Amino acid sequence: MGTNIETSLKKRTIYFDRVFWQEGFALAGPKELKGKLGDKFDFTLINDKFDQDTFEKAERKMFETALDGLLAKSKKLPIEIDVVLGGDLLNQCVSTSFAMRKSSASFLGLYNACGTYAESMILGAALVDKFLDNAVCVSGSHFSSAERQYRYPLELGVLRSPMTQWTCSGVGCSLLSRE
């Protein structure tokens, strides 16, 4: 019986031999800064709009800042990144897609809501293990733009219970590499 379970697990498990987590970068909004992990973030926003006209533009700038920060921390040049895998909570991964316009790396947009980061890490690891040298995995959201799409637009003025869920304003990214 034990060998059947082991055989079954081997068929459903992906093993990575040549993938290493090299560096990470975490960007957070003002509300997250006030939390227990506030001093652990690499970069925090002073205001929700990040000096932009709209929350969506602020979210795009959050992605750009996090990706630039990751490259600086890892001492990698943009040309050394083979692919960026990631997404956000907006339709068509609009914030991530616009942030990637300036990048020389290939971009694979992912939309898996709260699972986007895990999905990007799994796909990134598979690509680095077999084909590529460096992959950036990224996911993020902005409370105000996600609220507009998923719950109640802030402009509607709906009162919130203190126990209501609160979407994070933040971006997390990691560099996966063969080295």
Please tell me what each predicted stretch does.
Residues 94-99, 119-121, 146-151:
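Short, conserved acidic/polar surface loops in the N-terminal third of protein domains
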Residues 148-177:
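Active-site glycine-rich loop that binds ribose-phosphate moieties when present
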Residues 111-138, 176:
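Active-site-proximal alpha-helical scaffold in enzymes
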Residues 87-92, 114, 139-145:
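Acidic, glycine-rich active-site loops and adjacent beta-strand->loop/helix elements
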Residues 32, 144-147:
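A short beta-to-alpha transition loop/helix N-cap that caps and shapes the active-site region
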Residues 9-12, 124-127, 159-165:
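A generic local secondary-structure boundary/capping motif
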Residues 1-108, 166-168, 172-179:
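Conserved "HGTGT" condensation-loop signature of ketosynthase/thiolase-family condensing enzymes
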Residues 53, 61-62, 115-125, 152:
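Generic detector of solvent-exposed, compositionally biased contiguous segments
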